[in-house]
Design a protein with these regions (language model features):
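Transmembrane beta-barrel outer-membrane domains
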Residues: 20, 43, 76-80, 155-161, ...
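Outer-membrane beta-barrel translocator domains and adjoining extracellular loop/strand segments
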Residues: 16, 63, 111-117, 184, ...
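Predominantly transmembrane beta-strands of Gram-negative outer membrane beta-barrel pores used
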Residues: 29-33, 49-57, 61-76, 81-147, ...
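Feature marks short, surface-exposed loop/turn motifs that line or immediately flank catalytic pockets
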Residues: 9, 106-108, 185-187
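Flexible loop and strand-edge segments within Gram-negative outer membrane beta-barrel domains
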Residues: 155-161, 174-201
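Short acidic/polar hinge/loop motifs at secondary-structure boundaries
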Residues: 6-36, 40
């Protein structure tokens, strides 16, 4: 994952259960790179790369003195509430451009039709429950049956994320110099495998 051609140096590089700290809502465009072009971004991109182009550091002088974008989105599967906006402003005729953007997103647990686990996994859970019951572990058997019969919502899949970014750039002819600062704060759940925590000696 890249941001403006630079690797997204975050916890997602160390573990698959960490989300990338990239907000697609306020991105200008997203590039999917494959083939020889990915070698420009180092050996870790051998399988391809995703380059998110944002506007935190303005890349060009805007044609308007002030430009504002506002976005909103919702869905019913997760009861998504999402808002975002960005501002680009030329500071007179000085060659300075200011940018600011922010977003907020919240979702509830994912709503699904039917059972929350796949048929094969549900069969395994019910078989494990029967085995636990035969061995006299009635509480564990009941927990496994509850996990197998769970339906409607996938537990621990809700999220809440907010971002805030600001940047300046100075343009002089064909040259430019810019700096930016951003905050990305996210709380998200990782659904566990039902029945994965039952072990006996």
């Amino acid at each position: 994952m890249l941001i403006d051609g630079i690797g997204a140096i975050d916890a997602s590089n160390t573990s698959d259960d960490h989300a990338v700290s990239i907000d697609a809502l306020t991105a200008e465009r997203i590039e999917v790179l494959r083939g020889p072009a990915v070698l420009l971004f180092g050996s870790q991109a051998i399988g391809g790369a995703v380059n998110v182009i944002d506007k935190r550091i303005p890349l060009r002088l805007p044609s308007e003195s002030v430009h504002v974008d506002v976005l909103a989105r919702s869905d019913t599967a997760t009861d998504l509430r999402e808002f975002g906006g960005s501002l680009d402003a030329r500071l007179g005729n000085s060659g300075f451009v200011f940018h600011a953007d922010g977003s907020w997103r919240e979702t509830d647990d994912l709503e699904v039709a039917g059972f929350t686990v796949a048929p094969e996994l549900r069969a395994d859970l019910l078989a494990d429950a029967a085995e636990e019951e035969e061995e006299g572990h009635l509480e564990e058997a009941e927990e496994l049956r509850e996990a197998a019969d769970q339906r409607g919502f996938v537990p621990n899949t809700g999220t809440e994320t907010w971002t805030a970014n600001a940047g300046f750039a100075f343009f002089a002819g064909e040259s430019s110099l810019g700096v930016s600062f951003g905050v990305y704060d996210s709380e998200y759940g990782i659904p566990g495998r039902p029945g994965g925590g039952h072990h006996h000696d």
